C-alpha cells in the first residue's frame, strides 16, 4: 500500500471513529394511548383535533401522533374495539414533565369521559445524525 492510500485509509478510519463516539443523550420516551370512544360512541374527529390543538400542543414541546385500531377486554370479559390515537413524546426525565403528562391525561379523561389512558415510559438514548 503506497503512502497516499494509507493516508486516505487512516483519514477515513479516524472520521468514522469520531462519528461512532457521538454523545448519547438520555431521555424518556413516553407513549400515551388514547381511546377514541366512550359509552356514547366514537369521539368525533373534530373534538379530538380541538383537544390536540388546544391542550396537547400547548402542553408538550413536541410529539408524534400515530393512529391505531385498539382492542381490549374488561375484567368481566366483555370485549371492545375502538380507534385510538398514540402520542410519542421524548423528553427529559423531570418532575415538571411528569406533571405535564399527568395533567394532560386528567384533562382527556374528564373531557371525554374516559376511565384511563395507557402510559408507557422507557429510558432511551437519542441521537441526531
Locations of regions flagged by a protein language model:
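Bacterial Sec-dependent N-terminal signal peptides
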Residues: 1-22
